[in-house]
Amino acid sequence: MPLSASNPFEQDVEKATNEHNNSEDWGLIMDICDKVGSTPNGAKDCLKAIMRRVNHKVPHVALQALTLLGACVSNCGRIFHLEVCSRDFATEARGIINKAHGKVSEKLKTLMVEWSEEFQKDPQCSLISATIKSLKEEGVTFPAAGSQATTNAAKNGSSLSKNKEDEDIRKAIELSLQEQKQQQMETKSLYPSAEIQQTNQNLRKVRALYDFEAVEDNELTFKSGEIIFVLDDSDTDWWKGENHRGVGLFPSNFVTSDLNVEPEAATVDNSCVPEDATEEIKKAEPEAVYIDEDKMDKTLQVLQSIDPTDLNLDTDLLDSEVICQQMGPMIDEKLEEIDRKHSELSELNVKVLEALELYNKLMNETPMYSAYSKLHHPAQYPPTSSGVSVQSYPVQPPSGNYMIQGVHQVTVSQGYGLGPDQMGQLRSLPQNINSSDCNLYTKSNRQRMCHMKAITTWQRFSKHTSER
């Protein structure tokens, strides 16, 4: 890893790992750890400066650099963990284990085993375990987890944390003295006043349950899991405390006195959570899912442009992907509805075409109204020629059954008695009716009925179309 000339950690790292040092300077090491969190791109720059000293030809310098590296991993948080679990560090660590001095190699392997145990629940920090497994396949031996070497490393980490706490207490006392002088000149703020109580006793420590971002100048910013020294807890809602970022006020329900509680497992009464936090929780609730073509297009575009080798997952992309997957059943229902409507319109189209075809067929046929008119004007019938057969319609017996020859006979189940006036009307019918005239009359009525049926079908189709 080449070291940039503008690396702000170069001077401090060289001083902490000087070959003339007889012991570790834990005060300077803690200052470097604090500087990582307060410097932009601090984790990457600090790791570069440390690895430059780990590759030093003097083993004493390399061992001190590894001690500093372990301190940074233990105290600088997740941002430094991700840098240690990068491919660049894994590649360089592989080279150091294979080529460096024996003690340097053993200490680095011990640290890697300790880190793999610490990071085993974090999928983004799995590269350390993968590197150890790969080196074991190549024949490199590593100390077992829980062995004497790793136990010593854990003890060093515990002593390091204790030294850090002592150093933080010392700094807190110094800052408290300065804060007391400045407090008298400051104007009264919107928050409850908090005066510094100076005692020679050890300060009370609490652990942060949630992240808190300072809004006012006199507030204290901290992250979940960090240790805060309480300077004043006289007010029930707002306490005054100190951490490596400075001194300020913070909400008392954001911390706990149990230092062993993990931030993820800690629970807080909802009634104690501020209204702003409640609003943020409500905003985090999933929104109602509906078919959104723009969201699907954007998600596809991001998926096509993303780097598959990037281990940092985009939470927005994951949320968009989940929402798009939830749209699947809704899209299926919409397609079924469209297919059903398409089938209905297809059937209706077939019926309309059949009706139009029947209508055109009937309009092309010319009905014979001349024969039909003869039936309604019997007095104008011309005399029957000798070539046309004449059929007579004799008067039936009193039973009242009359049949016309040439027309389909219909059996009447009950006879009807006719009076003299009805008999006279029947005798006045023309005596000669041709069977072809009756057939034309029946055909004309059938054409009218078909015509009316076609018009009715067309009206129903027009009404159905206007309703849609």
Curated annotation (Swiss-Prot):
Localization (cell): Cytoplasm; Early endosome membrane
Tissue and organ expression note: Ubiquitously expressed.
PTM notes: Phosphorylated in response to EGF and PDGF. Phosphorylated by SRC.
Record domain VHS: where: 16-143
Molecular function GO labels: phosphatidylinositol binding; SH3 domain binding; ubiquitin binding
Domain named SH3: residues: 201-260
A GO-annotated cellular component: endocytic vesicle
Pfam families: SH3_1, UIM, VHS
Topology within the bilayer: Peripheral membrane protein
Domain ITAM: 358-375
Ranges for domain UIM: 164-183
Keywords of this entry: Cytoplasm, Endosome, Membrane, Phosphoprotein, Protein transport, SH3 domain, Transport
Record region (Disordered): 1-20, 146-165
Assembly and interaction partners: Component of the ESCRT-0 complex composed of STAM2 and HGS.
Name this polypeptide is given: Signal transducing adapter molecule 2
